[in-house]
Amino acid sequence: MTLWTFLAMEPAYFITLATVLGLLVGSFLNVVVYRLPIMLERQWQREAHEVLGLPVTEHERFDLCLPASQCTQCGHRIRAWENLPVLSYLALRGRCSACKQRISVRYPLVEVGCALLSMVVAWRYGASVEALVLLPLTWSLLALSLIDHDQQLLPDAIVLPGLWLGLIVNYFGVWVPLPDAVCGAVVGYLSLWTVYWLFKLVTGKEGMGYGDFKLLALLGAWGGWQVLPLTLLLSSVLGALVGVYLLRVRNDSMGTAMPFGPYLAIAGWIAVLWGDEIYASNMQLLGF
């Protein structure tokens, strides 16, 4: 009996394995969410300086691997045992071992969130090809949501590989036939692109960024054109609810910019996982 056969026969072990893997990936996503925007900003500055003929400032190596993680308050280099997902945070009681300043609770929350999402995928699909390819999509959408929330940025470095991966996956018909995936990517991009320009023509303002177009194209590449209506509906409802909360509870102004990427990511993830069931339930309620 192979390991894969064993995991397929014993779903609990696969779910546990996916959950632990989600914790580890969540720890890495914390690094990606913090460092990738800085890396991109430095790259853009360097390219702008080169185009303008200005001196280029050379920085020390800064990527997803180096320098080693350190405390943002005192610069204490985080040791291996201090970097264990969730457990280290609990052992340190949420404080740096050197300066005793509080560590942001967001770090363990991201790790736990990634673990829970991975667990849901494993529970939904079991030990299958669908689960194996959907886990990277889930992690990518989580990273994109956090970066967009923090920086109002959806990096091509994550979006474009995710889009191509969706097309490759559906080349083998994992979710939908390849023509549906290609159509989903094209229609996903053009639908928000059209909304963007109509809004800009009417108001003279930009209602969303180009990253949102590409993110919806990514979701269309994975789930086909069939997931787009549900994704747009759910993301619009989520965005509207959060917008009302920000206006009524936090007293934000109408002009406060609000990233749309997280709502697209949440809605698209739901649509890819449960879109067929949601459509079937709605048709049944309508008597079709």
From Swiss-Prot:
- Where in the cell is the protein located? Cell inner membrane
Major location (coarse): membrane
Q: Which GO cellular component terms, listed alphabetically, does the Swiss-Prot or TrEMBL entry include?
A: plasma membrane
Per the record, membrane topology reads:
Multi-pass membrane protein
EC id: 3.4.23.43, 2.1.1.-
- Provide the transmembrane region boundaries: 14-34, 103-123, 127-147, 158-178, 182-202, 227-247, 254-274
Keyword set, alphabetical order: Cell inner membrane, Cell membrane, Hydrolase, Membrane, Metal-binding, Methyltransferase, Multifunctional enzyme, Protease, S-adenosyl-L-methionine, Transferase, Transmembrane, Transmembrane helix, Zinc
Which InterPro entries is this protein grouped with? Peptidase_A24A_bac, Prepilin_IV_endopep_pep, Prepilin_pept_A24_N, Prepilin_peptidase/N-MTase
> According to the lineage, what is the superkingdom?
Bacteria
Q: Which GO terms describe its molecular function?
A: aspartic-type endopeptidase activity; metal ion binding; methyltransferase activity
| Cross-referenced Pfam families | A24_N_bact, Peptidase_A24
| Reaction equation(s) it catalyzes | Typically cleaves a -Gly-|-Phe- bond to release an N-terminal, basic peptide of 5-8 residues from type IV prepilin, and then N-methylates the new N-terminal amino group, the methyl donor being S-adenosyl-L-methionine
Positions that bind Zn(2+)? C71, C74, C96, C99
* Cofactor(s) this protein requires: Zn(2+)
Give the record's GO biological process terms: methylation; signal peptide processing
Q: How is the cofactor bound?
A: Zinc is required for the N-terminal methylation of the mature pilin, but not for signal peptide cleavage.
UniProt similarity note: Belongs to the peptidase A24 family.
What does the UniProt function comment say about this protein? Plays an essential role in type IV pili and type II pseudopili formation by proteolytically removing the leader sequence from substrate proteins and subsequently monomethylating the alpha-amino group of the newly exposed N-terminal phenylalanine.
Q: Specify the protein name.
A: Prepilin leader peptidase/N-methyltransferase
Q: Which species is listed as the source? A: Pseudomonas putida (Arthrobacter siderocapsulatus)
Identify the gene encoding this protein: pilD
